[in-house]
Amino acid sequence: MAAAAAPLADDGDGIVDRDMWLACAAPNSGRLPAVGSVVFYFVDGHAAQFCQFPAPLLEQLAVPGPRVFLCTVAAVRLRADALTNEAYAEITLDPVADHDVPRLAPAPAPAPAAAAGGQQLRYFVKTLMISDFDFRIRFSAPMADAKGVFPPLVDAKAVQPLLVKDLHGSPMTFDYGRKGKRVTLAKVWKKFRDDMDFVDGDSVIFMRRRDDDDDDGELYVGVRRQRTLERPLRNTMRRYRPPTPPQAAVQEAVLAAAGHAAAGERFTVAYRSRKDGDEFVVPREAVEEGLRARLTSLAEVEFVWAVEDGAPPIVGPRGKVTAIATGQLWRNLEIVWDGNSEMDMSANFWQVRPVEEVDISPSTPPPKRLKNCEIDDTASTSVSVDNGDEQVPTMRQRLEALIPDNI
């Protein structure tokens, strides 16, 4: 894969830029908010990032439901975890008071794309299986995946040194070779694997920024974990770095952020993109468009990803809504997806859209898609539609008793 070079979202560690962040993020995820934009911060989503079962943590909050806050983005910094080598975004948010909502400025325009022909970030992702870290002393990947990222082998029958840096710039020299139609990394791989304490489902991301005719760009490796580590890493390779924060400390960060948000105080959250649709800092426009949806049980929907503001959405699998939770905002839809989709059955209402049958006969004009500035939000909160004998409310009407005044 290749991604066009782009500037940092803000000052960060200096190595991780927007391209590297997106490469390390879950596929079709990892959207970063623009500085100055208006977003919703979902506490439940923040907790779910660190806890497989977040309910006990949420019960400790002194914040009443639905635990969602309107904020402006003060800063976005891209960093790498000092020990786990995960890329993450540090997002600083300013809560918006109810009386300030009408005076909010429009969202800033998306940053222009980088000019073509410059440096490209080429990368590939390998999701690790048990055999990759329990038995093998070497890493292997299909040659087709590694092409354009790993350099060509000088001698296909011999190994050669390959310098790879982690996301902090620390170098590792692997024995780079070939076995059949696969490339292999040995020597340092076992130590790197043991120090990272990988589990089944974790991923490694190899990245190289290079010109089209240059094979000498620096090679980096990042990590995407399936879930937060529940115990400290052994830390044998990086003795000078701090130990992994225990689960309790990570959970304290969620509680502190929720407390600051409720008090109207500036706070900072760390966002690690680990699975599709896990963003808990969501653009206001996306949430409000979802609030206009009219969904019922058994309604057919399709999942929609929006990786970058201003980019066309990516449409995912279809499914049917089987339940709509009335006591929560985060992942309040239960959906059975078609086929063998591995999508989470719980989805957020702004991540799906109804599948509608459109009459394309010449006598029927195409439906008009309103721009954000054309939508009368007060009308959308009060209008319902006929569904046979049933009045189908908007999502906003379903949730207006739960959501704060400033939503």
From Swiss-Prot:
Name of the protein in question: B3 domain-containing protein Os07g0183200
Keywords carried by this UniProt record: DNA-binding, Nucleus, Transcription, Transcription regulation
Pfam families, A to Z: B3
DNA-binding region location: 124-227
GO cellular component annotations of the record: nucleus
Major subcellular site: nucleus
GO molecular function, one term: DNA binding
Classification via SUPFAM superfamilies: DNA-binding pseudobarrel domain (SSF101936)
Organism: Oryza sativa subsp. japonica
